[in-house]
Every structure is written in structure tokens, then in C-alpha cells.
Amino acid sequence: MRFNNIRYSVILILSCLLFSDSSAQELITNVYGRNVQSLNGKWDAIIDQYDQGRKNKIYLNKKPEGKTDFYEYSFDHGLLLNVPSDWNSQSPGLNRYEGKVWYARRFDAKKEAGKRLFLYFGAVSYRSRVYLNGKEIGKHEGGFTPFQIEVTNLVKDTDNFLAVEVNNTRTVDAIPAMAFDWWNYGGITRDVFLVSTPKVFIEDYFVQLDKRKSDQVDARVQLSEGSANVNIQIQIPELGVNQKLVTDNKGFAKVSFGVKKLQRWSPDSPKLYKVIIASKDDRVEEMIGFRNLYAKGEDIYLNDKPVFLKAISFHEEIPQRKGRAFSEADAVMLLSEAKALGCNMIRLAHYPQNEYTVRLAEKMGFMLWEEIPIWQGIDFENEATKQKAGTMIREMVMRDKNRCALSFWGVANETQPSEPRNKFLKYLIETCKAVDTTRLMTAAFDLVRFNKEKQLFVMDDPFIQELDVVAINKYMGWYHQWPLAPEKAKWEVAKGKPLIISEFGGEALYGQLGNDDVVSSWSEDYQASLYRDNLKMFKNIPNLRGTAPWILFDFRSPFRFHPTNQDGWNRKGLISDQGFRKKAWYLMRDYYNNIK
């Protein structure tokens, strides 16, 4: 993006393209507000377990023409897969499959003079190569962020053949890498659109309140081409705003303007305004909220008032069907359960989730923490891995920067201190801030230890100085024994900064009752007791400004081996995989309801 620190942004973009496995183009902001043709539905598929598809050029989709012609592949009359969705939940044989699957479909395209066409993928997990009418047109790496490819001069009016090679193989240089505590879903997991735009269109924009000023909106607009002296209008009809801008020779324009009687967005009152951005040839509108957010001392301020974050985490998974969440209905289910718990914030773990979830969360009044999957064992010394991470975080921020609910950008989870790690994460923060400086930067750490001499919980990690808000994952009573009574446990961590307990809890199999002091019982009673103890300890953390139990629902994980109590599921959920609330759920609901 060309808004903040243009020269630095260009350097970051070039370095990302040099090192990342991606040939996709700059993202169109607010694709859901554009003229789109859906390519969702049933796609033909071929499982390519031994990686022969590209070698055999199956993307050409050739058919026998003569008596001696034959091909050892065909997309016809074979496996059908739904898009969007993961492949794991659609076929028993693909449940644990890791490798390549080819997706294919035909479509017609309405080509119009003076219009451009883009293929847009909401997400493909994890690597993808895209072929149109027998030609490779782009590739992308990263399973949770969108990408697009211009196809204006490549599509035909009728009978276009689109093939996508999808590969979810884990590798040491990937993000996440070889081992991670969730299911490795593969497939075209989010919407696929053919997007139509004018020749010169409104490619990108950013409209938000100034970080500290409650009556000043900052707006920036970027056209798709460097067209000078183009008139741009920004309108907010409900506020009587009608701002006129003129682009420079790079097609860029910005303005700051005052607003009167603005109702700021908050969890209690998630007000959104219709915002219209228009040029002579293009017009985009969407609902945008306005709020102030900043950290000062040990507090987090929302609309100039301290806020306590009553949070929860969830994966992008519907446990009842053992598959990825991909629809607005899925988002409603997940967010409704978080609302019933009394939450005002969601940590979208551990990766950017579906845009349906982000937009609906904003409407329902949830603040959001969004992160990329820098999860534990990443190759921090690998330059290519670093650039991949930079591309991912940039794609995440570009997609969601106009969502006022987005409050925190997360750069890592449970990483070990080292100089390569520090440089890697600092690069991610710089990449993030080159696009957006209005959110709070955070990361989750798990190295809090008990200092016997001081009788305090402490943490030694120099990187916390780079963050606006420090987050701690600590599983007292589960992975860590209590060194003293919970009510006597005091903390001295990240002094002078706001602190969030970003993960705590333990596992319980729904309906399993037993001793509340025996960890190996895997019982709801022990899980509830563990929660009580942690809530007692939280009273002794002076800079605690939020809690986020791990996790809302039980979720699938190959990490979890116990045959009777886990069976491939992480059972830390407050709600079971069948949707039943455990005893600890009621404890957290009461805890949150008593915080005003």
C-alpha cells in the first residue's frame, strides 16, 4: 500500500515479491462491495498424491482426438469437492490427507469494453498455482489470506477452464511450519470470485478516526493506476460529510476532516456508518465504524475510557462437522456462543479468519485480535520465511484495515527469545506499521516463571519493549503446578504496560465427572476447579487488562494422542465438540458478567 511511508512500503513490497512464492497482485479493498461473479460451488477434483499432475500437464485438460490418443487423467465423472470448504471433511479418504489436490471448473465471463477482470481467492490452504485455459497465471503461499490475479486479457466469453493446484504439505520453511496444534485442513477454503472493475478503479482506501481525536477522520484513497487530477468524493451521508479530493500523479489522495455528532463504535453500541468513495468511473460503499484506541501506561483506552478485555479465542472450525468454518452461518454460530459467554473481544486464533467472521464480529460489538500463524517452531533465520511472514501480515492488514473492530495485530505465539527471532518479529511490526499505525501491536509469550527468591511470577523477554500490549499464555494447574496457593500468587510482568492473559485453562471431556483435584481425571470438575484457581490469581496481577481463556470449542488436533479422553481432539474448550457447555463455561460467564 502506498499510504504511510511510501518509500519504505515499496521496499517491503519488493522484498516480499523477491522471496515469497507469490505472483498475485495488490489486493482490491472491499471485494464484497464490488461487482462480482461467484465461482463457488461444485468443482471437479483429482488427488495428486505422488505429485504427477504438473508433470503430466493435467491443467491442459486434454481429450482424446484420434483412435490412438489417450490420457491417464480426467476431471470428468470423478471426485467433486465443494468450494468453499476443506477437502478433509468432504471425503473419508481425505480426512488426514496432506499433499496435492487439483481443483477444476468451467465458467463463462461477461467481458465488457473498458472493464477489467480479476480472479479473487479468499484463501487457499496452503500453496496454490492457478491455471486459466491451459496457462499458469499465478501462484500464492499462505493458507489464510486472500490473493487476486488479473485475467482481463486471458478470459474468453464462454467455456473458460480454470484449474488450481492446491498443496497443504507441511514444510520447515512454511508458516506455520512442521508442527502446530490444530488440524491441517487443505483446499479452497474461502470464496472464489471473478471481480469486474472499471479500467481505472478505486483500488484501495482507508477511512478511520484519528488515533486520539474523536472528531477528526483521516482518509486516504489510491487508484489502480497513477492518474493525476482525478476527482474523488468521500461521503458519509448520515454525518453530512461530502469531501472532495484530487489525486496526485501517482493516483493517490488524502484528507483529514472534522465530524460533528459522531457516535463512536463500541462493544455496547457497535454503530456503523455508510461510507461512499466515488470517482468519475467507479463507486464503492461499505459500512464503517469509528472509534479511538490507544494504550497509555498500564491501560488500554477505547474512546478515551479504560477498557477490560473480556475475551475468548476460537479456531476457524465447526467442530460438529469436523471442518473449516467458511460461511456467514458458521460465523453466526461461533460469534453467538462468544456473545452468550459475555465477551467483548475475540482472539482469532492463530491466523486471519474468514472475512464473514471479521465483519459480523464488528456488527455484533466484538473487538478483535488478529494474527498470522507464527506459532512456536518457526525458522527465524531463514530470509525466505521472514519474507513470507511479511507478505502474510501485509495481506491480513490490507484486507481488514477498515474494520474498526480490529484492535490488535498479533505477530507471534509462544516463540523462544533469540536475536534472529527478535529481528524477525521487529520486521513484522515494521511491515504492519507501513500499512497501518492505528492498531495496538501484541504477541503472546509463554515464558513466565516463578522466582522463588522474590516469590513472584516474572518474565525475561526483551521483545516486550517493542509491543503496545503484552500477552501471556500460562496454564497454571495444567502444564504448570502451583508453587503456592493461587490467591497468594503475585505477578511482576511487563511493568508499565497493559497485560492480557491470552491463554489459560485445561482439558476436560464433556460429561466426565470426577475429583476436582486430580489432573488425570480429565473431568469437568477438575477443569472448573482449575478455572477458579486462575481467577483467584488474576486479582494479584496489577496491570491485568484482559483475559482470554483457551478456548471456546474443543478442536481437532493431531497433537492429542489419548485414545479415550482426546482421540485427536484438544479438549480445552469451554464447549464440547458437540456443542455442550462444560462447567467452566458457567464460571467464565459469571466472571465476565461481574466486570463492568
Feature-to-residue mapping (PLM):
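Surface beta-strand/loop "capping" patches
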Residues: 199-226, 592, 596
